[in-house]
């Protein structure tokens, strides 16, 4: 079995934010290394249940053993699916309401550290970046077959890369000679396309482009928006959603969606009281995002960009 070692970020804060009830029904939309799932399960009584989603079979296989004590007790159900299928998958299992939903977004450490998965510019590996290894679209297809305009669009939108046009132009001219096959080739190409002065600041020059391609391959923002909409719909009264984001695009999406659900819209002038059907049906648990402590930042450098937002259904 492939090891799936992963240091869970904001573990206590995220699970405590769910206010777990012993007999509640909970969903971990991002099983990964099982850290959040384990802590939720430890708080459940015999009538409580957890549904843990992951589109990566490696994570499911690892946690069959990692969480074996809870598997044996029948308290956890693993669901191999993209969390954009949240409502459908739960309906198939006879569940139409839940007491809490957790998201720990981004690529887990084992996916980054497994050179063969092609997520990282730190290793030279075939271009892949699929979280679900059964899906057809991969990074090689994006880099070699998508048009110049489509590449510029995703580099700007998902990578917020200032030099999107230069990188896309370099990719276009390079692939005319031969296909771009590996992460190493792509990283070198990006580095050569970005001006030397810009390469000296802001970390590795390939970071933003790799992020953009990964988001495009996995449709991460589309999946998140669809899933959050479903999670809000199936939440029981007093149920909560905890979301950890790791980059500004995700955080802005979550912040916007939570704001829409917790603020009163435009009201008619002179209205003496607010009708019940116009009152918000959700409230924010934390107005500002919760971030890792200094101790956690020292122990886990990958936690530095994490932000936790929590919402509750009234």
Swiss-Prot record:
GO terms for molecular function: rRNA (cytosine-N4-)-methyltransferase activity. Its EC number is 2.1.1.199. It is an enzyme of class 2 (transferase). It is found in: Cytoplasm. The keyword NADP does not apply. Its main location: cytoplasm. SUPFAM superfamilies: Putative methyltransferase TM0872, insert domain, S-adenosyl-L-methionine-dependent methyltransferases. InterPro entries: RsmH, SAM-dep_MeTrfase_MraW_recog, SAM-dependent_MTases_sf. Gene3D superfamilies: Putative methyltransferase TM0872, insert domain, Vaccinia Virus protein VP39. It catalyses: cytidine(1402) in 16S rRNA + S-adenosyl-L-methionine = N(4)-methylcytidine(1402) in 16S rRNA + S-adenosyl-L-homocysteine + H(+). GO terms for cellular component: cytoplasm. Keywords: Cytoplasm, Methyltransferase, rRNA processing, S-adenosyl-L-methionine, Transferase. It comes from the Bacteria. Coiled coil: none annotated. S-adenosyl-L-methionine binds at residues 34-36, 54, 83, 104, 111. One of its GO terms (biological process) is rRNA base methylation. Belongs to the methyltransferase superfamily. RsmH family. NCBIfam families: 16S rRNA (cytosine(1402)-N(4))-methyltransferase RsmH. Specifically methylates the N4 position of cytidine in position 1402 (C1402) of 16S rRNA. PANTHER family: 12S RRNA N4-METHYLCYTIDINE METHYLTRANSFERASE (PTHR11265:SF0), S-ADENOSYL-METHYLTRANSFERASE MRAW (PTHR11265). HAMAP family: 16SrRNA_methyltr_H. This is Ribosomal RNA small subunit methyltransferase H. It comes from Pediococcus pentosaceus (strain ATCC 25745 / CCUG 21536 / LMG 10740 / 183-1w).
């Amino acid at each position: 079995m492939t090891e799936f070692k992963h240091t869970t970020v904001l573990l206590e804060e995220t699970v405590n934010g769910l206010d777990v009830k012993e007999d509640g029904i909970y969903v971990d939309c991002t099983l990964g290394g099982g850290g959040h799932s384990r802590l939720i399960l430890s708080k459940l009584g015999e009538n409580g249940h957890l549904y843990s989603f992951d589109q990566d079979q490696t994570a499911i296989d690892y946690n069959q053993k990692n969480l074996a004590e809870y598997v044996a007790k029948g308290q956890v159900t693993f669901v191999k699916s993209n969390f954009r299928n949240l409502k459908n998958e739960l309906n198939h299992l006879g569940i139409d309401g839940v007491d809490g939903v957790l998201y720990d977004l981004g690529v887990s450490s084992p996916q980054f550290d497994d050179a063969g998965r092609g997520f990282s510019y730190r290793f030279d590996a075939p271009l892949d970046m699929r979280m679900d290894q059964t899906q057809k679209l991969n990074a090689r297809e994006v880099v070699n077959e998508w048009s110049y305009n489509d590449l510029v669009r995703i580099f700007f939108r998902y990578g917020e890369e200032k030099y999107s046009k230069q990188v896309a132009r370099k990719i276009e001219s390079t692939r005319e000679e031969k296909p771009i096959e590996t992460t190493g080739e792509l990283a070198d190409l990006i580095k050569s396309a970005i001006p030397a002065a810009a390469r000296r600041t802001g970390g590795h020059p390939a970071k933003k482009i790799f992020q953009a391609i990964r988001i495009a391959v996995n449709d991460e923002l589309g999946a998140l928006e669809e899933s959050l909409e479903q999670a809000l719909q199936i939440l029981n009264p007093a149920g909560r959603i905890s979301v950890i984001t790791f980059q500004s695009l995700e955080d802005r999406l979550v912040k916007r969606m939570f704001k829409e659900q917790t603020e009163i819209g435009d009201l008619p002038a002179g209205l003496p009281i607010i009708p019940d059907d116009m009152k918000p049906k959700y409230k924010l648990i934390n107005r500002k995002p919760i971030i890792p402590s200094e101790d956690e930042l020292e122990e886990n450098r990958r936690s530095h960009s994490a932000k936790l937002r929590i919402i509750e259904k009234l």
